Amino acid sequence: MEGNSMSTVRIGVVGCGAIAQVQHLPNLLELDDEFEVPIVCDVSPGQAEYVARRFKVPKYVTDIRDMLAADIDAVLLCHTDPKTEAAIQAFEAGKHVFIEKPICTSLQEADAMIDAMRKSGKVGQAGYMKVYEPAFEMAKREVDTMDDIKFVQTNHLHPSNELHLSHFKVKRFNDLPPSVMAERREASKAARREAFGDLFEKAESCGIAYGLIHDLYSLRTMLGVPSAVVSTEIWDDRRAITTILEYPNGARCVVSRVDLNKLWDFKQTLEIYSEEKRVILSYPTGFSRRVLTKLVVQGIDEAGDSYYKEPAIPWDSGFTRELLHLRECINQGTPSRSSLVDARDDIALIIDITKAYITQSPVYR
């Protein structure tokens, strides 16, 4: 994909918090031949003004309606959940939409966004940066050659994000209007009630399931959609979760996330095993820059000898590559590799994982 073969995309950024300051705005500035950022938006006036000044953005606003009235092609939504209303407004205003994960809480929200996207004819892309990592793409090619996958596991040991953010210049403001905070709480609660219906009260203690989003979209991209949630356990005061998934070929996947806040050592792996091959990805935290995802491949060659290899990984960021892919989708009509339609499957799986915990029984899909 040649950087200068397509027109520049004018994109507005909604949400000026940590992920915007650490990843999206620095990356958009580096991609100045491909993107222009004429406006940012945050409900915190101080946050919006600071980020606009720091990243040399000409204009800042506190109301997304003012942003959507501006001369922009697309919006990048990375503000605090929920993002559904903002996404729908953007589509209705004729803008392409990049929306950070998870895209929403309920299937009803996902369907509303997808409907607005289709009516607008615009691109809707989920912020699934891990599938754009060069190491992930290399791993996918290896996995596609595996005949009979037996076992899969993802392990996600998550320290406090504050440990990672301490190495970056991230500024926060406490001028958020109380009414905005109350509206967010009510909208989030309504979405959870929509997602879980009669199980809503019990689902209130299961929010960590949404923290599996990186693991789940990576699994879906690599292996497809599971046929069942066999079981789910949540423990340690809702800071740890393990769920077992079943795939159509009978393979099992064990997905675990544990919040271990104090020790600064982020661990996240995706491991795929068959009789003759093993593929293991090791990811860095999303709050890092210029840190590569690592790939290990083990197998048996044509001579019957075992091999172990760690391929050299190109120095490309998944965060940057997903933005370039968005531009390609906008300019050339390329189907998105992380479309809102695909992202809906991930929300459905999170809901089923939660239901398996609440009911203490399998959920067949």
Describe the role of every protein-language-model region.
Residues 171-175, 179-199, 271-338, 363:
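C-terminal glycine/acidic-rich active-site capping loop/insertion
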Residues 2-55:
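N-terminal Rossmann-like dinucleotide-binding module
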